Curated annotation (Swiss-Prot):
Pfam families: TsaD
CDD domains: ASKHA_NBD_TsaB
Record's keyword terms, sorted: Cytoplasm, tRNA processing
Described function: Required for the formation of a threonylcarbamoyl group on adenosine at position 37 (t(6)A37) in tRNAs that read codons beginning with adenine. Is involved in the transfer of the threonylcarbamoyl moiety of threonylcarbamoyl-AMP (TC-AMP) to the N6 group of A37, together with TsaD and TsaE; this reaction does not require ATP in vitro. TsaB seems to play an indirect role in the t(6)A biosynthesis pathway, possibly in regulating the core enzymatic function of TsaD.
Cystine pairs: none
Protein name per UniProt: tRNA threonylcarbamoyladenosine biosynthesis protein TsaB
Key word Cytoplasm present: yes
């Protein structure tokens, strides 16, 4: 099976399986996603003598995360698969972060959304992944309350490390379970609210 999977919600993570061989790339340089991602993907495919049409499924991170980075990842995947209508596996970036954690237990994943607010989700990782709190935007105060409520064993915050191997494995699973989508159905998981909305909700809570 040939699988390409990538996530650009924060840093660039790319995984590629060609048959039984797995290849992983993590880019932490200063170049913008739009500059580096298409180049790296093309180089990886060329070095492995793989054509895009040879791919069985392509996975892409849909967030939560920086919208600009997510759009670059999604646009890159759409450009690759649209001529061949290759199935796309939509990957929740917070779920991929939790699955990349080597330890089991309650996992809290959080990332700064804007000043005073975080994206946040909580999962139970134990021979699988079960959401205890779906991704949402919360204030810094709410994040403290959520941390107290769930008493997570693991807290993954801001610099989120996603394993390219996990991206590939999840893409394969979605392909096997027939949970892939068409390229024109890809949408980023956009959770941001306006500052006015967030401040109004905060005011209502007192």
């Amino acid at each position: 099976m040939n699988v390409l999977a990538l996530d650009t919600s924060q840093r660039i993570r790319i995984g590629l399986r060609k048959g039984e061989d797995l290849f992983e790339i993590s880019y932490t340089g200063e170049k913008k996603h739009a500059e580096i991602l298409p180049v790296v993907v093309k180089k990886l495919l060329d070095e492995l003598d793989l054509k895009v049409k040879d791919l069985d499924v392509v996975g892409v991170g849909i967030g939560p995360g920086g919208l600009t980075g997510l759009r670059v990842g999604i646009a890159t995947v759409v450009g690759l698969v649209s001529p061949y209508d290759i199935p796309v596996a939509p990957l929740n970036s917070f779920e991929m972060t939790a699955k990349s954690c080597p330890a089991d237990g309650v996992v809290l994943v959080a990332r700064r959304a804007r000043k005073g607010y975080h994206y946040c989700a909580v999962y139970l990782k134990d021979k699988g992944l079960n959401p205890l709190k779906e991704p949402s935007v919360v204030s810094d105060e709410e994040l403290e309350e959520i941390t107290k409520e769930f008493s997570p064993k693991i807290v993954l915050k801001d610099d989120l490390l996603i394993s390219p191997a996990v991206l590939v494995e999840e893409s394969e699973r979605l392909f096997r379970e027939k949970k892939t989508i068409h390229y024109y159905e890809i949408e980023p998981l956009y959770l941001q609210k306006s500052i006015a909305e967030l401040n109004w909700e905060k005011k209502k809570r007192g």
